[in-house]
Amino acid sequence: MKPNNPPRIAVLLVNLGTPDEPTAPAVRRYLKQFLSDPRVIEIPQFLWAIILNLFVLPTRPKRVAEAYASVWEGDSPIRKILNQQVDKLHARLEGSMGPFNISVHPAMSYGNPGLPDVMDKLCAEGVEHFVILPLFPQYSATSGGAVYDALTKWSLKQRNLPSYTIVKDYFAHPLYIKALADSIRRFQAVHGKPDKLMFSFHGIPQPYADKGDPYPKRCKCTAAQVAQELGLSQDEWIISFQSRFGKQEWVKPYTDVTLEQWGKAGVRSVQVVSPAFSADCLETLEELAMENRDNFINAGGQEYHYIPALNDDEAHIDLMEALAKPLVAGWASTLEGWT
């Protein structure tokens, strides 16, 4: 006999996070949560707590809030775009799996809507199966690893656990590579081809990579495959890493240093794409599109363009559907009495 209602399956699109508003107090709350995660800062926690509370949080939130204010239009860009991605993927999946009730929801590792809160709410509403899709194309312990941690901590508090599957990453998925290449082609059809195309990825400290974090290798694989898809020669593109924090060495080459060197060396035009970001955010709209543009132009460069992230582009939603739908179908096939 079938139950009265078909089983509920939820797909969660998870991104890093954002403050609730572009103010120093809101940014301070967000940074405290983010920078307190030992996945992000791998130094002894008692020592880092002193540095964070005495030196970072008293000064950094005001500067970061001003940067957020420069890109804030009614809401944080990353949350606004995440909601758009959710709506589009929901429209694709809703009603596509027979009698099953499938929904798509946003979640964040830090800030709101927090992943544990979303899980609590949906479980209370009767969701029994989850597909978790972290929107970090290249897995790193500092990003995707934090999603695994949050789910593990949440699970330890549950009496009746739901089923869930996590998509680790998709750095070489053919639809991802094609979507990136096509977005670059469309941009260059309007703005022309540059002297140099830069693939700028968010950096991680070099010691993290030395300990086995696969992120840099995944970034290099993504960039190389997109460059190959575009038919670029080796001297037409480069991979670099941005957003250094603190004084330790990070994975090189550095985006800002490379741009300054190019400007001084006579490189006239540069276009920058940042494949690690599934949605435009502070690091792309302010750091890449504005701050690093100034670095390049002030060093002697003449033309600089940032190529937007995939955001809610239909090809990006195609990728998300291709990642989520087989897992949703997998859950559906195990639900005896409803298949």
Curated annotation (Swiss-Prot):
InterPro entries per UniProt: Ferrochelatase, Ferrochelatase_AS, Ferrochelatase_C, Ferrochelatase_N
EC number, as in UniProt: 4.98.1.1
Biological pathway: Porphyrin-containing compound metabolism; protoheme biosynthesis; protoheme from protoporphyrin-IX: step 1/1
Coarse class of the protein's main subcellular location: cytoplasm
PROSITE patterns in UniProt: FERROCHELATASE
GO biological process: heme biosynthetic process
Coiled-coil ranges from the UniProt annotation: none
Superkingdom of the organism of origin: Bacteria
Localisation per UniProt entry: Cytoplasm
Short name of one Pfam family: Ferrochelatase
Keyword entries, A-Z: Cytoplasm, Heme biosynthesis, Iron, Lyase, Metal-binding, Porphyrin biosynthesis
Residues holding Fe cation: H202, E283
Gene Ontology MF term list: ferrochelatase activity; metal ion binding
Family: Belongs to the ferrochelatase family.
Function: Catalyzes the ferrous insertion into protoporphyrin IX.
Protein name from the UniProt record: Ferrochelatase
Organism taxonomic ancestry: Bacteria, Pseudomonadati, Pseudomonadota, Gammaproteobacteria, Moraxellales
Gene (name only): hemH
